[in-house]
């Protein structure tokens, strides 16, 4: 009899939960329509993988790319709509969140064609790779729109778990296993630190989890200047510093970049930074509204450390992927300037604009590295010597992307940095901007060193890798080359295109 009553209660509780979930999906599902498209694409991939004995590779890539493009289209149709909070306050849709979601989708759309030939040549499992990429993209999109502490914790964990699996995708490679282990341990530690910080926010605000309600709770409890908030701020800064690869939480980055498959590195190098930047902006700007001076100071210190450490250590690297790892640490230091400047002086618009250019510059560089690695099997910088004599198109593409990363005019990277530094200067961040300018000059040095090697390698310096290099025809259906061409063109956009991009970015402000 007791078991029968308990069973009935369980059925009733399950029915209530199901009906509540159905009600939320029915009335709030339109707010996550782009995410639902990706979920539908994931289900299709799983169905095809489980029902078909022979994998139709082009069809799998078509489904993945189509779901990403359709999700981008859904975002564009929703542009300029009124901000809305859905799912009982867990998720918020506004222009600011949506443009970061657009950037994440753009990264994934460019990374999938960049990975096609690499996966086929290395004979890795294709369906699982696409599932992990789409799931990580989904986690990043939910993180951009997260409006409460639980979603802010769960969404990056969804992204991180897929990132761990992708970084160790080449299971027989010892370096890949080492990279995955370090990434997993450091990621778990940073997540624990974030949860500890959230517990301080939760307790200090009187049990609130929504971002805006936390602010109201801190006002009601008079705890907005308490030591607990300072502790939460420090722990959140450390946790987000890991996600963004900010010094001194950057130690995992070079090892993961070097050990992971190159297309995976290309994907992680941009999507993780875009998603974490969106989340950091909202967390610092809303719950820590009353501690703006404190978190400004903390981020300034981390930005300076990242710009100096990243660019100085990059000079000494012999591996192309490790060099780009340290370069990305310096690059995120520039992005932090936009977060510190904030809404008042166009900081968010400059940050978004620079991130758009950074995506094209970084993915273009990695596309060149993937092509060179597939044709030579090496990642050493010295092995690029004299590449121009064998493949001028690839050498010029790599040179343009590197020059744009360094910020030389008239390439896109120059105008992106110029606008970012100008906004920082107007906001009074003189020392931070000066450090940014000096470290940009340092970065130009090691980029030019590689370009000199590409163009002027003497015969005695050319390694067997380049001597035996097989150049592909100029017109090719190679998906990596197509992705590379798109990124190179976007990296060389002249400054005349800056104004419309900045104006669009201005519409994303709170």
Curated annotation (Swiss-Prot):
One of its GO terms (molecular function) is NADH dehydrogenase (ubiquinone) activity. One of its GO terms (cellular component) is chloroplast thylakoid membrane. Keywords: Chloroplast, Membrane, NAD, NADP, Plastid, Plastoquinone, Quinone, Thylakoid, Translocase, Transmembrane, Transmembrane helix, Transport. The chain crosses the membrane at residues 24-44, 57-77, 99-119, 124-144, 149-169, 183-203, 227-247, 295-315, 323-343, 354-374, 395-415, 418-438, 482-502. It is found in: Plastid, Chloroplast thylakoid membrane. It is a multi-pass membrane protein. It comes from the Eukaryota. Its main location: plastid. One of its GO terms (biological process) is photosynthesis, light reaction. InterPro entries: NADH-Q_OxRdtase_suN/2 (IPR010096), ND/Mrp_TM (IPR001750), Ndh2_N (IPR045693). It is an enzyme of class 7 (translocase). Its EC number is 7.1.1.-. It catalyses: a plastoquinone + NADH + (n+1) H(+)(in) = a plastoquinol + NAD(+) + n H(+)(out); a plastoquinone + NADPH + (n+1) H(+)(in) = a plastoquinol + NADP(+) + n H(+)(out). NDH shuttles electrons from NAD(P)H:plastoquinone, via FMN and iron-sulfur (Fe-S) centers, to quinones in the photosynthetic chain and possibly in a chloroplast respiratory chain. The immediate electron acceptor for the enzyme in this species is believed to be plastoquinone. Couples the redox reaction to proton translocation, and thus conserves the redox energy in a proton gradient. NDH is composed of at least 16 different subunits, 5 of which are encoded in the nucleus. PANTHER family: NADH DEHYDROGENASE (PTHR22773). Belongs to the complex I subunit 2 family. This is NAD(P)H-quinone oxidoreductase subunit 2 A, chloroplastic.
């Amino acid at each position: 009899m007791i078991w029968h009553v308990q069973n009935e209660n369980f059925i009733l509780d399950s029915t209530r939960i199901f009906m509540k979930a159905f009600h939320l999906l029915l009335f709030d599902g339109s707010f996550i329509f782009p995410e639902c498209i990706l979920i539908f694409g994931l289900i299709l991939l799983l169905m095809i993988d489980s029902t078909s004995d022979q994998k139709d590779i082009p069809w799998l890539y078509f489904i993945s790319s189509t779901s990403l493009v359709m999700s981008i289209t859904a975002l564009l149709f929703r542009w300029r709509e009124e901000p809305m909070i859905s799912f009982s306050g867990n998720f918020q849709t506004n222009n600011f969140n949506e443009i970061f979601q657009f950037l994440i989708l753009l990264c994934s759309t460019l990374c999938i064609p960049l990975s096609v030939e690499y996966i086929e040549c290395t004979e890795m499992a294709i369906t699982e790779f696409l599932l992990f990429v789409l799931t990580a993209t989904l986690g990043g999109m939910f993180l951009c729109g997260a409006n409460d502490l639980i979603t802010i914790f769960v969404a990056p964990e969804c992204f991180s778990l897929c990132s761990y699996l992708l970084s160790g995708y080449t299971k027989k490679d010892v370096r890949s296993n080492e990279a995955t282990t370090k990434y997993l341990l450091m990621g778990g530690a940073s997540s624990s630190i974030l949860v500890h910080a959230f517990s301080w926010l939760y307790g200090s605000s009187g049990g609130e989890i929504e971002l805006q309600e936390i602010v109201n709770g801190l006002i009601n409890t008079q705890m907005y200047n308490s030591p607990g908030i300072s502790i939460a701020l420090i722990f959140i800064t450390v946790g987000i510093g890991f996600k963004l690869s900010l010094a001194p939480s950057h130690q995992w980055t070079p090892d993961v970049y070097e050990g992971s498959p190159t297309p995976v590195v290309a994907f992680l190098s941009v999507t993780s930074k875009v998603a974490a930047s969106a989340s950091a902006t909202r967390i610092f700007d809303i719950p820590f509204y009353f501690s703006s001076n404190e978190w400004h100071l903390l981020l300034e210190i981390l930005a300076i450390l990242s710009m100096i450490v990243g660019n100085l250590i990059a000079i000494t690297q012999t591996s192309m992927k490790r060099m780009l790892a340290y370069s990305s640490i310096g690059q995120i230091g520039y992005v932090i300037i936009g977060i510190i400047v904030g809404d008042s002086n166009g900081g968010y618009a400059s940050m978004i604009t620079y991130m758009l250019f950074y995506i094209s510059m970084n993915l273009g560089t990695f596309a060149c590295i993937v092509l060179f690695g597939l044709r030579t099997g090496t990642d050493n910088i010295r092995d690029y010597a004299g590449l121009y004599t064998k493949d001028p198109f690839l050498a010029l593409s790599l040179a343009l992307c590197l020059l744009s990363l360094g910020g030389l005019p008239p390439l896109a990277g120059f105008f992106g940095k110029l606008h970012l530094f100008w906004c920082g200067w107007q906001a009074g961040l003189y020392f931070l901007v000066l450090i940014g300018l000096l470290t940009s000059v340092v970065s130009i040095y090691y980029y030019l060193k590689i370009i000199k090697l590409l163009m002027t390698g003497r015969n005695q310096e050319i390694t067997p890798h380049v001597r035996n290099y097989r150049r592909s025809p100029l017109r090719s259906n190679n998906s990596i080359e197509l992705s590379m061409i798109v990124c190179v063109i976007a990296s060389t956009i002249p400054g005349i295109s800056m104004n419309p991009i900045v104006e669009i970015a201005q519409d994303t402000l709170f």
